[in-house]
């Protein structure tokens, strides 16, 4: 499992993964896990990052280090680029990530409370990242995540970004 070093270290320490299955990765690092033409780059993000584990011996929940928060830029062999933002809040590095990686598809949280709300997500989409397409995520999975795709679209207003309408379990081809 490629992920932030702190998270992979925690998973190894708890015995969930073996060291061979948990290679370390750091922000700014790029890997080519399935060949030279597909690249995954770990980028900075802003959100909490902990790993909740139910100890099988005590049956109690434990909070462990989850590693630094990150997002992922995935560049496919045809050049199509995806930016998975994760549980992100609006932050300044988005002004660098958008122009540097120029994602075709943005997977963007819109639910609010733990992540950006629809208005903040629309600002990040339209003013900072400027993707061709955006796929709203991290909404309606928790009562506190009240933002909706309709609110995101309304906040986005006139934009060249196409918003992907999808429900959990939907599949899309690009």
Feature locations, PLM:
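Phosphate- and divalent-cation-binding pockets in alpha/beta enzyme and binding domains
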Residues: 9-13, 93
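Metallo-beta-lactamase
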Residues: 64-122, 127-129, 137, 141-143
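Divalent metal-coordination and catalytic microenvironments
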Residues: 1, 40, 87, 106, ...
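Short internal beta-strands
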Residues: 1-7, 133-138
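Binuclear metal-ion centers of metallo-dependent hydrolases, dominated by the metallo-beta-lactamase
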Residues: 15-19, 23-34, 120-174
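Short, polar loop motifs at secondary-structure junctions
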Residues: 4-10, 26-29
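Glycine/Thr-rich phosphate-binding loops of Rossmann-like dinucleotide-binding domains
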Residues: 11, 50, 116, 144
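Core dinuclear metal-dependent hydrolase active-site scaffold
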Residues: 24-99, 168-174
């Amino acid at each position: 499992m490629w992920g932030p070093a702190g998270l992979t270290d925690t998973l190894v320490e708890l015995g969930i993964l073996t060291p061979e299955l948990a290679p370390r990765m750091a922000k700014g690092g790029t890997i080519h896990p399935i060949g030279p033409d597909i690249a995954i780059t770990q980028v900075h993000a802003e959100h909490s990052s902990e790993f909740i584990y139910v100890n099988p011996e005590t049956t109690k929940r434990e909070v462990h280090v989850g590693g630094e928060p990150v997002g992922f830029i995935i560049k496919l062999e045809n050049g199509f680029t995806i930016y998975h933002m994760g549980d992100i809040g609006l932050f300044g590095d988005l002004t660098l990530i958008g122009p540097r990686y120029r994602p075709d598809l943005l997977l963007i949280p819109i639910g609010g409370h733990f992540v950006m709300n629809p208005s903040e997500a629309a600002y990040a989409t339209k003013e900072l990242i400027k993707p061709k397409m955006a796929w709203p995520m991290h909404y309606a999975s928790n009562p506190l995540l009240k933002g909706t795709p309709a609110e995101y679209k309304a906040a986005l207003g006139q934009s060249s970004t196409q918003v992907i309408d999808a429900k959990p379990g939907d599949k899309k081809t690009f």
